[in-house]
Structures are given as structure tokens and as C-alpha cells.
Amino acid sequence: MEAKTFNPPKRILLGPGPSNVHPRVLEAMARPTIGHLDPAFVGLMEEIKFLLRYTFKTENEITFPVSGPGSVGMETCLVNLVEPGMKVAVCINGVFGGRMKDIVERCGAKAIVVEAGWGSAIDPQRLEDVLKSDPDIKLTAFIHAETSTGAQSNIKELAEISHKHNCLAIADTVTSLGGIPVKVDEWNLDAVYSGSQKCLSCPPGLSPVTFNEKALHAIKNRKTKVQSWFMDLNLITSYWGSSSRRSYHHTAPINALYGLHEALLLLKEEGLENSWKRHKLNSEKLITGLKQLGLNTFVKEEERLPELTTVKIPDGVDDLKVRNFLLEKHNIEIGAGLGSLAGKIWRIGLIGYSSNEENISNCLTALKEALK
């Protein structure tokens, strides 16, 4: 086998993530690497924390990007707050709620499942009923934007119910942050994580997280050691915390953090509300075009994500053949269904930098050709 310099094809990324990356972000990532404890880099870290607080709409001091993809953010929140023997209410309406359950059980806790059909939002009343029936539950976990189905749940209400029953609440905002409203402080979310590769329009590899004081108090007063050295918040905050003197914890992905900083600047320049409006408007245009092609959406309108549209594959249409046609003939990537939805839906993402009118037009043209 011969290896040579890799030159990737130019793709239009219209799947569930990653999204296309803004040229300014790519340019930022190509700048010279400096040390992860360099005073200039420490200054950049502070700016990233400031910009993430803006994006999460929070004043939480402990707000920073974990080194790793969104799944590492998920594990960071769970392994710090879950202890062996605990009961945790896990809301599942797709693949990623199921992943939360798996992590909870790996931590030696018992997952109490609050389930909804794939493609539906979590019913807050079902969570209420579960928490009423078992006062030993101390933590809830739920997905804001379920990437496997394109459905969004009302996490403000889920958090309110959680606190009513003296539970801390963990929220997954991997696909929602930057694309639809996420208001950490106003909604009283205790621990939240996201991902860099969705509406923040960065390459994969960083997972922004934020923890409020209630969550930090629970972590500091654990009966057992956090079951991960790398993700132990008691350790990592010596590097990402507020101290003027930073301690070595791990070597941060320096150039990736350059990119995240630039992406967050771009989002602030656009304005969060404008970003939310752009994603909503472009979603409406895409769905209008899909209907004209005779295609139907999978999620009902009031629960549908604007940044990720799931489309029912018509009877007799070969899922893989259509996706391959789009990729090979038009350089467009759309996503397949996962789990029980494999072969039944396509996932079309207008996410972050990929959410624009030109991409909508190109996607609809390509689908029209593929379905002839």
C-alpha cells in the first residue's frame, strides 16, 4: 500500500453532522501552534469561556470545551454526577438517549427509562409520573435535539419537573446549541454538553460543557471517586478553571481550540437570535421543496428540529442508491437512518455554516434527479 498526501473531495455536508466549516475557522486552525500553558493561549482559553457563556446563555463559571467529541461531553456530565447505586431517570426517544442509559449503567447506577417513540418528543407527564413513583431518583438526563430522529423535546419543562422532585438535570444540546434556543440559566439546567461539529460549524473533536453551582456541589460531595481520571471535573478545572495560575492536566488540542474560538466569534457576530431565525427560515424552505417532490417529513411540525429534517423514504426507493447518487454526482452528503429507522428515513441537515439557500437548492435538485 502506498500512502501520499490526502486531498479530500469538496463535499456539501447536509447530513446530521459534521457541518461544513467556515473558511475563517479553517484559517484559524492553520495558525502556528503554541504551548498549552503559554500565557497567550491561557488568554485565548478565557475568551473561549466568555464566548461559550454567551452561546449557552449562562453565567456559570465552569463553562469550557472538553477535549473530545460530543460523546465525551456526555460522559463528562454523567461520570461526574452519577455514582454507583444511584437511580437515574433517563429519557429515551432515539439512539442518543440509549447511549446515556448505557453510560449510566457502566457507572454502576440503575437507569429508570422514560420512553417515547422514535420521532416523538419526551412527554413531560411521563417523567413526572416516574419521579412521583420513585423518590429515590436523584438525577434526570434527556436529549434536547435527538439527532437520530430530528425531534426536539421541551427541556425547560423537563428540568422544571426534575427540580420539583429534587433531581439534578443533565441536558444534551449537541445538535441544538446555536441552532435553536438553549437558555441554560433561564431554564435552570444543571449540567449541559454540546458538540463543536454541528451548529457551531467546527470540525469534530471538542465538546462544550457547562455546570451550575448545584451540580458542582454534588460533584465535590461525592461518596466515591469519579470513574474517569480524564473527565474528573475536580481535576480538569485546575486547567480550565478561574485560577490565574493554571496547572497541567492534559495537552489541549490547541489548533482545534483556535478554530472553536473563531467559530464562536462568527456566531456572536451573527447574533444568536439571528442564527436561530436563519435555521428556522431555511428549514421551512427545505420542507416546502421536499413536499413539492412528494416527500413527507417524519416528525410532526411542532416537534420538528429546524436544523435537522428527517424525511420518510418512499416505498420502492433504494435508500443507499439515492445517497450514493447524491454523493457521487453532486458531492452532497445526507444521512441515513439509525437503528430501527435504518432504510426508512433520510436525515437532511441544514446545520450551522451549511444552512444556506444555495445548499437547499442544490439538495432539492439532486433529490429530484435521484428520484426520477
What are these regions (language model features)?
Residues 10-67, 71:
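A glycine-/small-polar-enriched, mobile loop at the entrance of the PLP active site in fold-type I
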Residues 20-21, 197-288:
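Active-site C-terminal subdomain of aminotransferase-like
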Residues 61-89, 93, 97-101:
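Conserved beta-loop-alpha segment that forms the PLP phosphate-binding cup at the N-terminus of a helix
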Residues 122-178, 191, 199:
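Active-site phosphate-binding strand-loop segment of PLP-dependent enzymes
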Residues 296-329:
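Conserved PLP-binding catalytic core of the aspartate aminotransferase-like
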